[in-house]
Curated annotation (Swiss-Prot):
Disulfide-bond pairs as recorded: C40-C110, C56-C64, C152-C220, C257-C325, C271-C279, C371-C441, C385-C395, C482-C544, C486-C520, C496-C503
Name of this protein: Polymeric immunoglobulin receptor
InterPro entries linked to this entry: CD300_family_receptors, Ig-like_dom, Ig-like_dom_sf, Ig-like_fold, Ig_sub, Ig_V-set
SMART domains noted in UniProt: IG (SM00409), IGv (SM00406)
The organism of origin for this protein: Homo sapiens
Residue ranges annotated as Extracellular topological domain: 19-638
Keywords assigned by UniProt, alphabetized: Cell membrane, Disulfide bond, Glycoprotein, Immunoglobulin domain, Membrane, Phosphoprotein, Repeat, Secreted, Signal, Transmembrane, Transmembrane helix
Transmembrane segments: 639-661
Pfam family, one: V-set
Length: 764
């Protein structure tokens, strides 16, 4: 069962497993006695350049008999009239066959290696019989859409007689044109009859925009009687043999179209043939363009001789097929339009490396575009242009590798070369919605390496955070921060100064984690650029960015202006709201950064200072009042103490006597209630002790802690322990013992109060 399934899969998908990169003409047409030249293309790898090339004829049973090969073999049928030439530098080989006969018609293969392998291409050769020539018959062979001139001689006696041209249709001749002014409706607007001067015995019929239906036998005639002069002509209208074009996937192709000066002022077009005779317009000079080619096609201005060219970049597999260029007032293929044909094959075994065709960036952010070029042309000039779709399309240059940058892109566009790497990088930052579009990577060398990339502007915020334009003071030190989120933790981080030829790297300082990002502040970084003793030369654009090896990532730009020193002191420029949350805007600098910590709102500083000033003023007022009245209070306090102390002693003695009496009265009261009373007092004291800073459970706190992360205030409350502290057991005491202890405490307190009363007036 499994074998059956595999067999079915191989039968359904043969093209996938046997797809060949060999390419040649699908059809070749010629006539007996002529010769043909057949070109076959192959990927120019080292193995392919040196392997065997062959031309073989397919048999009825599926075999393919070799007729000629690159190893010197020539079949007897081809002896003396055929050869095979290999062009390894171009990845092509050519088979030339002369002295064609109808026996040469058939199905052939051109290929590499062994005949039975899949590295081959099928070619159909059709050899037609030559025209049946009559006496004095002239043969005209002209391509479709072109112009033919049929010359008709006559004798002197017929110089003044009627001149005419007939076409043989079936058994009867049909008048096409004559000297009296008649024109057959099928030739209206594209035929004329010219009679030469009286000294020449010749008239000519010119037919423009030849159609396939124009082919056939014609008869020129001067005069209508038996003495008339007649001349036979055979007109063959040929479909143009397509020129083979073999290009790499992701590469570029150019179609050069030369239609002649007679159509110099007629609308031009390029179309691709689909099913049957339909030819869908790819681009024309009337402004039409197929959506599939948006952003990657240009129709170059036409010359006075009617020639023009069409460039297509970023080739795709689906671009392969037959293309026609032509001229017609409608801007599309019509019968009789002069045309040229190409057969485009897109080689999927491309030498052009893959690179992103779409790059996305956010407003205010940046993009880095990788552009491949031919390694053999490392010294070529590199360009980057913006594709514009108006009319025929154009691509004005924005930057090149020789230091030219378009004025409106200064400070935010740079072309960086990587010698020997086969790529160059274009960085564009400070993005706006107007930067969305298609861009082309070019060199002044190999035109096949033109590539296209589309830049899309999407919603979001830039990943790198820098201040806006900052101002430095001459002779002072400037410090500019750049905040990198954690996603770039493994990237190389850098600062550089922009100029027309690139961005010169500058030393920078890693100041540890950045607090501008709340999700992974330990992996985020703050990297600062420091300019010591600022001079006028330090003014300009500075970039901070990330890269991995030769691949550049995001960048952010800061413009540094330089001004004279001000009399009111210097100013330290740093990132305002540097540690703000990612969804907050980064303001221009003007606030001091303190030890890479979160910058607080300046208004908070002002409020705190105002409160502090108010407190200082209040404390000062109290101090002055206390010092001014201290002397008056000293005298009155002595008299008051001398009066109150004896009274207090009397009251204390009375209280003790009452306490002793009550204690004796409660002698037989249950001691459990007394113990409970003491326990209540002890727990109350325990709770009150916290007001003075005591905390028995050091692992728990009832205080709510406040933490500032990323400029946002986040409050984290710790959980207080619910475990109660048990009161330790104490020894039981009688009521008498308690009364005696209370009396001793009273005597000690009375002695202390008396001592303070005596010492107080002396110190005052």
């Amino acid at each position: 069962m499994l074998l059956f399934v595999l067999t079915c899969l191989l039968a359904v998908f043969p093209a996938i497993s046997t797809k060949s990169p060999i390419f040649g003409p699908e059809e070749v047409n010629s006539v007996e006695g002529n010769s043909v030249s057949i070109t076959c293309y192959y990927p120019p790898t080292s193995v392919n350049r040196h392997t065997r090339k062959y031309w073989c004829r397919q048999g009825a049973r599926g075999g393919c008999i070799t007729l000629i090969s690159s190893e010197g073999y020539v079949s007897s049928k081809y002896a003396g009239r055929a050869n095979l030439t290999n062009f390894p530098e171009n990845g092509t080989f050519v088979v030339n066959i002369a002295q064609l006969s109808q026996d040469d018609s058939g199905r052939y293969k051109c290929g590499l290696g062994i005949n039975s392998r899949g590295l081959s291409f099928d070619v159909s050769l059709e050899v037609s019989q030559g025209p049946g020539l009559l006496n004095d018959t002239k043969v005209y062979t002209v391509d479709l859409g072109r112009t033919v001139t049929i010359n008709c001689p006559f004798k002197t006696e017929n110089a003044q007689k009627r001149k005419s041209l007939y076409k043989q249709i079936g058994l009867y001749p049909v008048l096409v044109i004559d000297s009296s002014g008649y024109v057959n409706p099928n030739y209206t607007g594209r035929i004329r009859l010219d009679i030469q001067g009286t000294g020449q015995l010749l008239f000519s019929v010119v037919i423009n925009q030849l159609r396939l239906s124009d082919a056939g036998q014609y008869l020129c005639q001067a005069g209508d009687d038996s003495n008339s002069n007649k001349k036979n002509a055979d007109l063959q209208v040929l479909k143009p043999e397509p020129e083979l074009v073999y290009e790499d996937l992701r590469g570029s192709v150019t179609f050069h179209c030369a239609l002649g000066p007679e159509v110099a002022n007629v609308a031009k077009f390029l179309c691709r043939q689909s099913s049957g005779e339909n030819c869908d317009v790819v681009v024309n000079t009337l402004g039409k363009r197929a959506p599939a080619f948006e952003g990657r096609i240009l129709l170059n201005p036409q010359d006075k001789d009617g020639s023009f060219s069409v460039v297509i970049t970023g080739l795709r597999k689906e671009d392969a097929g037959r293309y026609l260029c032509g001229a017609h007032s409608d801007g599309q293929l019509q019968e009789g339009s002069p045309i040229q044909a190409w057969q485009l094959f897109v080689n999927e075994e491309s030498t052009i490396p893959r690179s992103p065709t779409v790059v996305k960036g956010v407003a205010g952010g940046s993009v880095a575009v990788l552009c491949p070029y031919n390694r053999k042309e490392s010294k070529s000039i590199k360009y980057w242009c913006l594709w514009e779709g108006a009319q025929n399309g154009r691509c004005p240059l924005l930057v090149d590798s020789e230091g030219w940058v378009k004025a409106q892109y200064e400070g935010r566009l740079s072309l960086l070369e990587e010698p020997g790497n086969g790529t160059f990088t274009v960085i564009l930052n400070q993005l706006t919605s107007r930067d969305a579009g298609f861009y082309w990577c070019l060199t002044n060398g190999d035109t096949l390496w033109r590539t296209t990339v589309e830049i899309k502007i999407i919603e979001g915020e830039p990943n790198l955070k820098v201040p806006g334009n900052v101002t430095a003071v001459l002779g002072e030190t400037l410090k500019v921060p750049c905040h990198f989120p954690c996603k770039f933790s493994s990237y190389e981080k850098y600062w550089c100064k922009w100029n027309n030829t690139g961005c010169q790297a500058l030393p920078s300082q890693d100041e540890g984690p950045s607090k501008a990002f709340v999700n992974c502040d330990e992996n985020s970084r703050l990297v600062s650029l420091t300019l010591n003793l600022v001079t006028r030369a330090d003014e300009g654009w500075y970039w901070c960015g990330v890269k991995q090896g030769h691949f550049y990532g995001e960048t952010a730009a800061v413009y540094v202006a330089v001004e004279e020193r001000k009399a009111a002191g210097s100013r330290d420029v740093s990132l305002a709201k540097a540690d703000a949350a990612p969804d907050e805007k980064v303001l221009d600098s003007g606030f001091r950064e303190i030890e890479n910590k979160a910058i607080q709102d300046p208004r908070l500083f002002a409020e705190e200072k105002a409160v502090a000033d108010t407190r200082d003023q209040a404390d000062g007022s109290r101090a002055s009042v206390d010092s001014g009245s201290s002397e008056e209070q000293g005298g009155s306090s002595r008299a008051l103490v001398s009066t109150l102390v004896p009274l207090g002693l009397v009251l204390a003695v009375g209280a003790v006597a009452v306490g002793v009496a009550r204690a004796r009265h409660r002698k037989n009261v249950d001691r459990v209630s007394i113990r409970s009373y003491r326990t209540d007092i002890s727990m109350s004291d325990f709770e009150n002790s916290r007001e003075f800073g005591a905390n028995d459970n050091m692992g728990a706190s009832s205080i709510t802690q406040e933490t500032s992360l990323g400029g946002k205030e986040e409050f984290v409350a710790t959980t207080e322990s619910t475990t109660e502290t048990k009161e330790p057991k104490k020894a039981k005491r009688s009521s008498k013992e308690e009364a005696e202890m209370a009396y001793k405490d009273f005597l000690l307190q009375s002695s202390t109060v008396a001592a303070e009363a005596q010492d107080g007036p002396q110190e005052a």
